[in-house]
């Protein structure tokens, strides 16, 4: 499955760890074998293949000038050179990243030659994208946008398709993939017919605001008319003849709604025409004169108004022309680079190209959907838009390290603002960073991260008012304190400080982001244990430290000191608790025993990369020694795990590497060089740093080819087949690692997520290579790491503190033509030049440069240097800047034009509607706490008020305000709090000085109607102490107010304050025979101030005689039923009293079948729910949302279920409901949660026991994918519980479980008249209400009433209480009247009542009560008795009205009760019965009403639909050569074939069938296992649907034949290519063709061209008399048996068989089969009788027992055999003892006798005593005692002493066995020979001689690296072999467990 666990999933890590432990003998040495030390310093550089000019410098003649933007200059030159006019004139960045053809294909080359790799992208992924729209998958060989279109995430539909018709037929156009070309801004390719007489050049692109455009240039070699048709599943609504199609789509997880618009233009400007939900146009082409048309699909979102502008400009505006549209889009796209991206140039173009590519990755993986709400309202960096596709906190900080260098702050600021606003509330009350709730299916935790630290760095780059720093500090402080307090979170993985210290602890490797690569978790015996972690703690320290600095910048000294104290405590505990002094290393530490974790990762060094470790400490510096050794932490591959530790454990888990590893390695390298003397000590040199830059660049290029960059999620060398590369005698991952970095390098596996970002590297080019150091003040600091051999580089187009900045290194001035040396340019002016690379701090105001290192650099300050560089907090933002809006969304006013940015409503005295004050989770104070974080809100859930109110009294008294901001909570995904939406409208008032309330006048609202999250209301200033907001909720939703803010801005509003028309939207959620669900939304602007909004549904049109019946016409969302099938136009109208808005929708109405889906009224539960889902996720199956896409958290599944019970999914109602059918929608992710194989329904009977539901005739349990699986019941099932049951052990998923109850005609209402002052409990509203059904019956259905309070009854009042009725969607109502004169109301008048019943009902039940109206005018229900004569007079066979009189039982009515019964015709009935269908005879496959196939058993390009019975059979027109395309003729299952796959015909009536045949096809003349392909199945069979709903095999009367059709044999056999079978006739409604497909070493699939079915007339002949003679004889025999000779139980069962047989004998209609069956049952029953033992048999057994006892007591036999005999004696005595008190069977006595005899025969006589020889053991003991201690290690010596003691103990044991003696001697000898091996001089590196004896490599004070080779193991092996001891080599072969699929 696809749940939140990251990257790689292991089937059984415990098993892998166990194998590792065995393989190493439990050893914990760092390295298991004597691998030669390979220094990273000796690692070579990679070799890049592909283009000699990867940066396309030859195509760019722009002269570099650091004083201006090189990208701007280049862009301007591109425009001058006509870039953008067509695809032959590209912009420079597009040229650099251009991809052509369908390359690469998995073939790479290095210096050694060619090699293969897995995971190439084939140029299949579409680069062009909009801010929210893109192609998640892309099918480039089809015209249009074909694949899975994403709007922020997958929609599971193509954008649009294009078909071509010419010469009267549809044309097949094939892509010429060699002509494929794509750049970041567009994609183009060529399509043509087979004869190339017709070709189309397609150019497609997606505009910034999500308009998907395809320009098609159509050309023909001859004059002809060509008709083009385009269709989009997004937009198919529109009248024929119109020029545009529209649609409406709720995007995934209901995050927003898009309103697609679809149109197309011809070259002459005319529009395409709508026809049948598609757009079409006919082009009259002249030979070789091309015409260009343009198709556009606008994915319009209300929150992106420019999406409408961009679409309309192309539909009818100035971009209607195809060329103009294209130029606008690609030009806009490429201008973005100028506005945002820094330019980097170095001596290595291959690195420079990765810089460009990575800027593009940051852009491609950025979501900027501006969705209002709590998910993606900010521009946000996403991890893997082609993969996980979520803002994941683990990687958000990494992405900001790059995006902070974008010139606009919105990208980095947006990411940390998003993380802050979606933070999760902890049990301790803090809000900690948590993965974005927009996509809970892909990551849903709080992982290690440094968001606050990265955010603080971004602030130091871009700056802003101090309130920006304060915002960051607040969210950072919440996060750190939340993590430190996390011990009791519902998700245990979110508990990260279980021992109350200041360190992060985890038990799950995914928290690191490295999953099974994190070797520390694989320590044997530690599975599931927690450890304090260096990585998470370092990141938390960085965040705490950043929060402290941000508070300090904001002027909040108290909080700054608080957070600094927390940071200092974390630092202290890391350096004390996690520092292992014994070997000078940081290590993780196990919580349970305080032991250091033995195994390490790069993660152990995060305290270095984050700067936590103090500098100047030689011990701390020595910890970096491991980076000197490639066997520990190689430069490449840059793994997570210390490779020596991985080797010591035999490489458990996975061993991947990724940019997520390269990033911290770069950080460790740079920190080590700068701060920890790593270069000085030789651990990490500048040369190594350079190599790492090169290898990081190399990793991006597929096959090492610089034409094809692709960052995958991870890479590995698992499938790299190598020998013993390092010469250690063992072939393992160390050899693969070494091979990967040799011969120029190679990567053999690239993972499945393409063009993702997991880690970043561009920051190192700016900060480490160029040396830019972000600061708060107005100084500029440079601190570069010198790259050996690089004599020049530049970083240009930087934006820093609101200034343009360039950095240039030109050693001798020859490369760029400027000053020689190291120069800084600010604001277009030279600031200074240093003669060398050095650590420098430039003070612009003073015009000075401070040299901070010992370089003795000589610096010259520029004469015109800019002096007014701002400090970070001096940077301002205006209203036009995007960043101002972002902060407004987060509750911070940074608009520089604002008179005051102080929110006067913060911490106000706030009161809300009284009911809500009781909800401590969401109290009113949350609305003024200064937080817009999503879970801090005041909520009205549970309120039954029409409106709810908040009063805000300012804490500082009267305030002048002109700007109020409201932030509303919005529910969306499963990780948001359900049931909340922005209000339908809200009203603002202020309190005047006299205490009265007045509406705030002249309101200008943005948006006009309430929106999720941010709403701004500007108005004429008022002075007040208190404001009030009144909210009207949307139907069925509560209102959540995250924050209310009030400002005095002095800014005049733009916009209107006039009343706006109510906003109305509506759509059809679903439409079935149980009604259509209508979802409506009505919003208003709150004007007029005293007005109320009303809503009404009405029918505009429909089929003749068709009527739409609304369950509640006044509700915005309701259900409607129809009496006739057809199209209905329905209208939702909303009025505010002045203006009216409406929305019309079209519904295809299906006549009601008399049922309604009552599942939403139930509560859902399951036997087990996936542990990664919310515990109550079963509720998703009744939420009304059918989901087929891979969204686990929006569905239910039981992945991980090990309960051992049959999985079930249950619905429970408040009372019994009459169910008639059910429908289940199954869900699969195609992996861990497979498609359901079978299921059944059960209901709870009256006793609560589960019973199988009996299905109606012809019904069966189907398992169809992507549609509902419906079953109808034989009879109504009256129950309060229904469940789906799956096979035991099944892993299953379900999206929706619908249960349909008989729909009542009406439900009785309730009337109560009570005394004023009564208590609510005195109302005693009934627990059930009576529901009336069309068949005349009534049922008492459970009702749940709304809340009634004592306050409502305290004074005279009249009100209604709604009741939810189980089984009735429209519910009921109780009319309550509280009157002070109630006691005097004794006699009233019974009110007339009515009841409707359908004609021909069997009977009618009448109401038990009637309302009686009393003199005060109010009703009360009283019991009634109806007149029998009137009831009998009702003629249910005739339509008419009938009156029934009745008497109120208690005499409270002075008049007779009156009931009018309306007998009406059944609108769904028929006056004449349907005739029986004629039998289908002959070959009837064409008469099948439906064809389906088994789940997931067809190739998408070769579906079964329309193929199997289309009459297209194999003939001589089929291919004669191998491997030709027949996909349009067959049901093909290549890649999907599996045993038991089937095709199914449904006939819609009973048919009798006696033959079937099929034509199979193989696409190779001979089966070729090496090629695979389509192949004839090994076997096939026919199954039919039996009456009991099961599938049964037919009984062949002739064997099945299998005929092979192929290019060598095209139906030219005697059988004409048919495989056939004849069988005993079966009568059924459905038939299956079941296949056993061929399997081979390659991928195969079955192909079926045609499937024939032969029917015969199955009409039953008149029955002949049945012969019952045999049954009569069998009954006589049975009745003559003596019951006393058998056990009572067996006789009772036999008697039932006799009774059943007698009943058949007495049945005149019994068939011959039934008679024969009873004869057989009587015979079998008699055989099953259990005979009782006779007295003789029991006496014989007793004698045998006595004899056996004598033998047992004789003492002649072994104890073991006597023990077995005694058990047999005991068992035999037990049998006889049973006979004393009850029945003992003959079989039991016989069995006991046999067992006893067997035990006697098995007695064994005692052998002579064993002689044990101990001489050899004695000799070994004496030898060991003389051992020389100096020849042993201390550990080996202690082991020897232990073995001596153990051997002596065995020697002294007189009862010791020979085996014990031998084992003791073996163990002692092994320990004796475990001596040390003599160390040999010389290098361990293959090919290197031992000539370098320089002391620099052998310093006496050097701490040796961990993981050094331990040669003792090898020596001991030799010695032990000499001693006759064999060492068992255990080595796991093949794949070591690295899974390539995310769980």
From Swiss-Prot:
Catalytic activity field: 4-O-(beta-L-arabinofuranosyl-(1->2)-beta-L-arabinofuranosyl-(1->2)-beta-L-arabinofuranosyl)-(2S,4S)-4-hydroxyproline + H2O = 4-O-(beta-L-arabinofuranosyl)-(2S,4S)-4-hydroxyproline + beta-L-arabinofuranosyl-(1->2)-beta-L-arabinofuranose
EC number assigned by the record: 3.2.1.187
Gene Ontology MF terms: hydrolase activity, acting on glycosyl bonds
Gene3D superfamilies: 1.50.10.10, AF1782-like, Galactose-binding domain-like, Immunoglobulins
GO biological process, one term: polysaccharide catabolic process
Membrane topology category: Single-pass type I membrane protein
Biased composition (Basic and acidic residues): 1890-1902
Record-linked InterPro entries: 6-hairpin_glycosidase_sf, 6hp_glycosidase-like_sf, Big_4, Galactose-bd-like_sf, GH121, Ig-like_fold, MGH1-like_GH, TAT_signal
Protein localization: Membrane
Protein name, per record: Beta-L-arabinobiosidase
Annotated source species: Bifidobacterium longum subsp. longum (strain ATCC 15707 / DSM 20219 / JCM 1217 / NCTC 11818 / E194b)
């Amino acid at each position: 499955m696809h749940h939140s666990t990251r990257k790689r999933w292991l089937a059984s890590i415990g098993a892998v760890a166990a194998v590792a432990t065995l393989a190493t003998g439990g050893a914990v040495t760092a390295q298991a074998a004597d691998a030669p030390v390979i220094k990273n310093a000796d690692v070579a550089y990679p070799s890049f293949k592909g283009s000699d000019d990867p940066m396309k410098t030859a195509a760019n003649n722009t002269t570099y000038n650091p004083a201006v933007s090189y990208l701007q200059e280049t862009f301007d030159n591109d425009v001058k050179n006509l870039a953008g006019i067509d695809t032959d004139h590209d912009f420079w960045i597009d040229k650099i990243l251009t991809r052509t053809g369908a390359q690469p294909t998995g073939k790479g080359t290095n210096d050694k030659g060619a090699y293969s790799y897995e995971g190439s992208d084939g140029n299949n992924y579409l680069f062009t994208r909009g801010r929210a729209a893109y192609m998640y998958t892309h099918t480039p060989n089809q015209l249009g946008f074909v694949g899975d279109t994403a709007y922020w995430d997958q929609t599971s539909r193509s954008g649009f398709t294009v078909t071509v018709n010419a010469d009267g037929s549809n044309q097949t156009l094939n892509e010429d993939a060699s002509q494929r070309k794509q750049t970041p801004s567009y994609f183009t390719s060529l399509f043509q017919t087979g004869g190339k007489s017709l070709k189309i050049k397609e150019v497609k692109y997606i505009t910034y605001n999500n308009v998907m455009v395809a320009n098609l240039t159509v050309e023909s070699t001859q004059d002809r008319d060509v008709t083009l048709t385009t269709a989009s599943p997004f937009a198919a609504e529109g009248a024929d003849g119109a020029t545009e199609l529209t649609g409406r789509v709720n995007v995934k997880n209901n995050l927003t709604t898009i309103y697609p618009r679809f149109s197309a233009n011809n070259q002459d400007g005319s529009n395409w025409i709508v026809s049948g939900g598609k757009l079409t146009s006919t082009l009259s082409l002249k030979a070789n004169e091309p015409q260009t048309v343009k198709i556009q699909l606008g994915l319009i979102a209300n929150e992106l108004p420019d999406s409408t502008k961009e679409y309309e400009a192309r539909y009818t505006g100035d971009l209607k022309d195809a060329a103009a549209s294209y130029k606008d889009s690609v030009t806009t796209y490429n201008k973005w680079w100028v506005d945002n991206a820094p330019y980097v140039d170095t001596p290595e173009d291959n690195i420079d190209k990765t810089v460009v590519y990575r800027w593009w990755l940051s852009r491609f993986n950025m979501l900027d959907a501006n969705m209002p709400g709590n998910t993606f309202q900010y521009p946000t960096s996403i991890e893997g838009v082609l993969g996980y596709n979520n803002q994941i906190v683990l990687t958000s900080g990494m992405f900001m390290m790059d995006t902070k260098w974008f010139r606009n702050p919105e990208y980095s600021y947006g990411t940390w603002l998003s993380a802050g606003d979606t933070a999760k509330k902890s049990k301790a009350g803090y809000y900690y960073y948590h993965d974005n709730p927009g996509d809970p299916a892909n990551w849903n935790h709080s992982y290690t991260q440094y968001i606050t630290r990265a955010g603080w760095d971004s602030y130091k780059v871009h700056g802003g008012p101090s309130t920006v720093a304060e915002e960051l500090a607040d969210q950072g402080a919440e996060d750190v304190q939340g993590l430190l307090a996390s011990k009791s979170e519902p998700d245990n993985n979110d508990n990260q400080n279980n021992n109350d210290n200041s360190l992060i602890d985890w038990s799950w490797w995914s928290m690191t982001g490295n999953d099974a690569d994190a070797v520390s978790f694989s320590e044997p015996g530690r599975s599931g244990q927690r450890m304090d972690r260096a990585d998470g703690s370092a990141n938390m320290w960085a965040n705490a430290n950043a929060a402290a600095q941000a508070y300090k910048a904001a002027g909040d000294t108290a909080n700054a000191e608080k957070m600094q104290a927390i940071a200092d405590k974390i630092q202290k505990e890391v350096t004390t608790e996690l520092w292992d002094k014994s070997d000078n290393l940081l290590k993780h530490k196990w919580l349970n025993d305080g032991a250091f974790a033995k195994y390490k990762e790069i993660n152990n060094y995060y305290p270095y990369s984050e700067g936590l470790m103090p500098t100047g400490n030689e011990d701390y510096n020595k910890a970096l020694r491991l980076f000197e050794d490639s066997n520990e932490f190689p430069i490449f591959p840059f793994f997570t795990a210390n490779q020596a530790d991985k080797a010591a454990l035999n490489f458990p888990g996975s061993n991947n590497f990724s940019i997520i590893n390269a990033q911290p390695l770069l950080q460790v390298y740079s920190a080590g060089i700068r701060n920890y003397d790593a270069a000085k000590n030789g651990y990490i040199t500048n040369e190594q740093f350079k190599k790492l830059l090169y290898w990081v660049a190399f990793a991006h290029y597929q096959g090492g080819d610089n034409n094809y960059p692709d960052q995958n999620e991870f890479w590995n060398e698992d499938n790299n087949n190598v020998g013993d590369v390092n010469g250690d005698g063992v072939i393992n991952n160390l050899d693969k690692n070494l091979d990967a970095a040799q011969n120029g390098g190679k990567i053999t596996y690239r993972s499945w997520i393409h063009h993702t970002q997991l880690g970043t590297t561009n920051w190192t080019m700016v900060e480490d290579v160029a040396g830019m150091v972000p600061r708060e003040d107005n100084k500029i600091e440079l601190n570069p790491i010198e790259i050996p051999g690089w004599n020049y580089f530049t970083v240009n187009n930087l934006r820093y503190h609101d200034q343009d900045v360039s950095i240039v290194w030109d050693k001798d001035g020859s490369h760029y033509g400027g000053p020689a040396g190291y120069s800084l340019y600010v604001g277009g002016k030279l600031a200074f030049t240093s003669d060398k690379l050095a650590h420098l701090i430039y003070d612009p105001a003073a015009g000075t440069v401070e040299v901070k290192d010992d370089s003795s650099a000589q610096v010259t300050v520029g004469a015109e240097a800019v002096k007014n560089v701002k400090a970070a907090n001096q940077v301002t933002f205006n209203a036009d800047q995007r960043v101002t809006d972002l902060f407004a969304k987060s509750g911070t006013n940074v608009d520089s034009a604002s008179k005051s940015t102080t929110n006067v409503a913060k911490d106000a005295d706030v009161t809300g509607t009284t009911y809500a004050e009781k909800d401590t989770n969401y109290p009113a104070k949350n609305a003024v706490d200064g937080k817009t974080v999503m879970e801090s809100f005041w909520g009205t859930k549970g309120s039954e008020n029409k409106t709810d109110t908040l009063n805000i009294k300012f804490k500082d008294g009267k305030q002048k305000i002109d700007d109020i901001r409201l932030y509303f909570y919005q529910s969306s995904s499963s990780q948001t709090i359900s049931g909340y939406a922005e209000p339908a409208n809200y009203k603002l008032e202020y309190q005047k000085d006299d205490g009265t309330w007045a509406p705030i006048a002249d309101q200008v609202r943005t948006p006009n109607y309430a929106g999720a999250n941010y709403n701004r209301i500007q108005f004429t200033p008022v002075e007040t102490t208190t404001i009030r907001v009144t909210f009207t909720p949307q139907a069925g939703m509560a209102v959540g107010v995250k924050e209310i803010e009030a400002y005095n801005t002095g800014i005049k509003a733009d916009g209107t304050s006039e009343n706006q028309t109510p906003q109305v939207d509506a759509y059809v959620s679903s439409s079935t025979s149980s009604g259509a669900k209508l979802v409506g939304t009505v919003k208003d602007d709150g004007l007029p101030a005293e007005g109320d909004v009303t809503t009404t549904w009405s029918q505009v049109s429909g089929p003749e005689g068709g009527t739409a019946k609304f369950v509640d016409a006044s509700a915005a969302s309701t259900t409607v039923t129809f009496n006739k099938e057809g199209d209905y136009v329905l209208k939702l109208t909303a009025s505010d009293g002045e203006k009216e808005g409406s929305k019309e929708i079209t519904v295809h109405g299906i006549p009601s079948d008399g049922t309604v889906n009552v599942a939403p009224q139930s509560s859902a539960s399951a036997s087990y729910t996936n542990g990664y889902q919310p515990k109550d996720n079963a509720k998703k199956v009744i939420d009304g949302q059918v989901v087929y896409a891979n969204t686990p958290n929006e569905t239910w599944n039981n992945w991980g279920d090990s309960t051992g019970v049959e999985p079930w999914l249950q619905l429970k109602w408040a009372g019994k409901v009459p169910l008639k059918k059910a429908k289940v929608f199954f869900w699969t992710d195609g992996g861990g949660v497979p498609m359901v194989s079978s299921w059944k329904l059960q209901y709870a009977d009256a006793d609560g026991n589960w019973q199988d539901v009996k299905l109606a005739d012809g019904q069966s349990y189907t398992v169809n994918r992507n549609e509902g699986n419906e079953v109808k019941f034989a009879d109504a099932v009256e129950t309060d519980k229904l469940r789906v049951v799956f096979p035991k052990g099944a892993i299953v998923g379900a999206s929706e479980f619908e249960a349909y109850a008989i729909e009542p005609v009406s439900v009785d209402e309730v009337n109560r008249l009570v005394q004023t002052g009564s208590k609510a409990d005195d109302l005693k509203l009934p627990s059930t209400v009576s529901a009336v059904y069309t068949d005349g019956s009534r049922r008492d259905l459970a009702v749940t009433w709304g809340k009634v309070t004592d306050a409502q009854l305290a004074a005279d009042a009249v009100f209604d209480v709604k009741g939810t009725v189980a089984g009735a969607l429209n519910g009921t109502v109780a009319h309550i009247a509280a009157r002070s004169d109630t006691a005097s109301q004794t006699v009233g008048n019974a009110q007339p009542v009515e009841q409707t019943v359908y004609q021909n009902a069997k009977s009618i039940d009448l109401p038990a009560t009637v309302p009686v109206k009393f003199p005060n005018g109010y009703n009360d229900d009283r019991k009634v008795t109806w007149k029998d004569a009137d009831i009998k007079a009702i003629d249910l066979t005739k339509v008419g009205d009938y009156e029934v009189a009745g008497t109120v039982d208690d005499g409270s009515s002075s008049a007779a009760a009156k009931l009018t019964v309306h007998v009406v015709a059944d609108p769904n009935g028929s006056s004449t019965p349907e005739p029986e269908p004629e039998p289908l005879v002959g070959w009837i496959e064409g008469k099948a009403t439906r064809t389906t196939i088994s789940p997931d058993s067809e190739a998408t390009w070769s579906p079964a639909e329309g193929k199997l019975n289309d009459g297209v059979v194999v003939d001589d027109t089929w291919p004669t050569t191998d491997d030709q395309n027949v996909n349009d003729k067959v049901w093909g299952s290549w890649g999907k074939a599996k045993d038991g796959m089937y095709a199914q015909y449904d006939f819609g009536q009973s048919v009798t069938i006696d033959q079937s045949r099929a034509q199979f096809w193989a696409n190779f003349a001979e089966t070729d296992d090496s090629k695979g392909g389509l192949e004839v199945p090994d076997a096939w069979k026919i199954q039919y649907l039996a009456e009991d709903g099961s599938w049964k095999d037919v009984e062949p009367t002739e064997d099945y034949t299998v005929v092979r059709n192929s290019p060598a044999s095209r139906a030219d056999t005697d059988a004409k290519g048919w495989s056939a079978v004849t069988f005993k006739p079966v009568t059924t409604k459905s038939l299956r063709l079941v296949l056993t497909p061929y399997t081979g070493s390659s991928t195969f699939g079955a192909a079926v061209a045609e499937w024939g079915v032969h029917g015969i007339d199955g009409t039953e002949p008149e029955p002949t008399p049945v012969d019952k003679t045999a049954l009569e004889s069998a009954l006589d025999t049975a009745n003559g048996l003596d019951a006393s000779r058998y056990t009572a139980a067996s006789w009772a069962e036999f008697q039932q068989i006799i009774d059943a047989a007698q009943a058949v004998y007495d049945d005149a209609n019994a068939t011959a089969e039934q008679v024969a069956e009873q004869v057989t049952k009587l015979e079998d029953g008699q055989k099953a009788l259990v005979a009782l033992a006779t007295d003789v048999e029991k006496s014989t057994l007793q004698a045998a027992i006595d004899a056996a006892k004598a033998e047992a007591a004789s003492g002649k036999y072994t104890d073991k055999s006597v023990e077995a005999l005694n058990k047999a004696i005991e068992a035999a005595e037990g049998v006889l003892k049973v006979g004393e008190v009850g029945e003992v069977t003959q079989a039991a006595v016989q069995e006991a006798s046999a067992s006893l005899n067997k035990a006697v025969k098995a007695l064994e006589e005692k052998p002579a005593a064993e002689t044990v020889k101990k001489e050899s053991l004695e000799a070994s003991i004496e030898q060991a005692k003389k051992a020389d201690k100096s020849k042993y290690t201390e550990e080996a010596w202690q082991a020897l002493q232990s073995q001596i003691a153990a051997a002596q103990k065995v020697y002294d044991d007189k009862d010791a066995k020979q085996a014990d003696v031998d084992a003791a001697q073996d163990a002692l000898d092994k320990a004796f020979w475990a001596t040390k091996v003599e160390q040999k001089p010389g290098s361990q590196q293959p090919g290197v001689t031992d000539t370098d004896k320089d002391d620099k490599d052998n310093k006496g004070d050097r701490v040796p690296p961990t993981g050094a080779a331990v040669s003792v193991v090898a020596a001991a092996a030799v010695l032990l072999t000499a001693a006759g001891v064999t060492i068992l080599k255990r080595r796991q072969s093949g794949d070591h467990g690295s899974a390539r699929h995310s769980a």
